[in-house]
Design a protein with these regions (language model features):
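Phosphate-ester processing/binding pockets and catalytic centers
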Residues: 1-178
Length: 178
């Protein structure tokens, strides 16, 4: 699971720039990496994201082991979400505390409720601030959701060795969380 932190005054610019690279308002990294042209666009987007003058920050919560009984991966997701929310909502966040988290819409209400329960537990434990909000939407409606998808795919390809030149393009901007 990956978070991309984009400052409020940069969001419109970043949206316009990534749509310009893609040439439209639709992007899916996994789908794009299946073609030569899509892989080229992926590299171009990652080069944009990795630009050293940018203010974006990318955080990766890497759950190394999915428990044997976690057949749907929801436990691992909750662990990753816990790591991201507590880090990005704290003073340790590279851009200062963040309270609005925009997530890709989950497939089912049950899955969305699992995320809400994770947030509620963190709030009850005092791990996140009361103003913390989760908002779920589609990457078709919020192009900034392309960023965590790109970063996560690049990181995964680094681990698997499938396309090892992707992650180095953004690695300086990334923090891998436990």
């Amino acid at each position: 699971m990956t978070a991309a932190v984009v400052q409020a005054d940069q969001r419109d610019l970043v949206r316009a720039d990534i749509q310009g690279v893609v040439g439209g308002s639709y992007w899916h990294t996994t789908e794009s990496l299946r073609t030569v042209e899509g892989t080229s666009k992926t590299r171009e987007l990652l080069d944009y994201l990795g630009e050293p003058t940018g203010t974006e920050a990318y955080l990766i919560a890497h759950e190394r082991r999915v428990a044997p009984g976690d057949t749907d991966g929801e436990g691992a997701r909750a662990g990753c979400l816990h790591s991201l929310l507590t880090h990005v909502n704290s003073a340790a966040s590279p851009t200062g505390p963040v309270e609005l988290f925009v997530l890709e819409r989950r497939l089912t209400a049950r899955m969305a409720n699992n995320d809400a329960r994770t947030k509620a537990r963190l709030l009850a434990d005092g791990r996140i601030t009361p103003g913390t909000r989760l908002y779920q939407t589609s990457p078709n409606d919020e192009q900034l959701l392309w960023l965590p998808d790109l970063v996560c795919s690049a990181y995964r390809h680094q681990i698997t060795g499938r396309t090892p030149d992707l992650f180095p393009r953004i690695s300086a901007m990334c923090t891998v969380l436990p």
